UniProtKB/Swiss-Prot annotation:
One of its GO terms (biological process) is proteolysis. InterPro entries: Peptidase_C15 (IPR000816), Peptidase_C15-like (IPR016125), Peptidase_C15-like_sf (IPR036440), PGP-I_bact-type (IPR029762). This is Pyrrolidone-carboxylate peptidase. Homotetramer. The active site is at residues 80, 143, 166. GO terms for cellular component: cytosol. It is an enzyme of class 3 (hydrolase). The gene is pcp. It catalyses: Release of an N-terminal pyroglutamyl group from a polypeptide, the second amino acid generally not being Pro. SUPFAM superfamilies: Pyrrolidone carboxyl peptidase (pyroglutamate aminopeptidase). It comes from Clavibacter michiganensis subsp. michiganensis (strain NCPPB 382). It comes from the Bacteria. Its EC number is 3.4.19.3. Keywords: Cytoplasm, Hydrolase, Protease, Thiol protease. It is found in: Cytoplasm.
Amino acid sequence: MPTVLLTGFEPFDGDTSNPSWTAVQEVRDRWDGDAEIQVRQLPVDFAKVDDALRAALAEVDPDVVISVGLAGGIETLEVERVAINVDDARIPDNTGFQPIDEPVVDGGPAAYFSTLPIKAAVAAVRTKGIPAVVSQTAGTYTCNHVFYLLMHELRDRPGTRGGFVHIPYSTEEAIGTDRPYMRMDQLATALTAVVRATLANATDVKVGSGSLD
């Protein structure tokens, strides 16, 4: 039976919750498929997140890794295509550290591509009536940092596939604000569809999912 590792982040930027962590726990708790789901929370801390991710990989020894993060302002689930070797933080992390134009990995390649079936995953989410797209940038904050480091670490795990998914706020974080959001049950359903599509597709489907901007 394959093992799937899902990671989410702790709260940051003044929020008291992070939907990425809540959502991956919901996926685990609702899961009834032919795979084991493990979840781990990662810190929003550039200095500590590397060791936390490496420890999770060593402990779980997964066949699939899907890291999940919050992108405030988006309205759809975004399955990321590429991670770049740049930390350029618009805001400080939870310790007050704010790297600007620093590499994620010294001497690492400029970018890594996801090894998830990203287009099949987007299609699977859409069949649930939930909007989803292939995203061409994971930003330059801790989400991209984790995505890049994950793919860098997976070079030594050729049998393990990995990638990153951005989600919007959930209802909990959006109350009393004008933030776009999805209900938590929608987020969990969408991420479950991503997991199932990944397990069902060893290679991706050939459909156009590019961007003109």
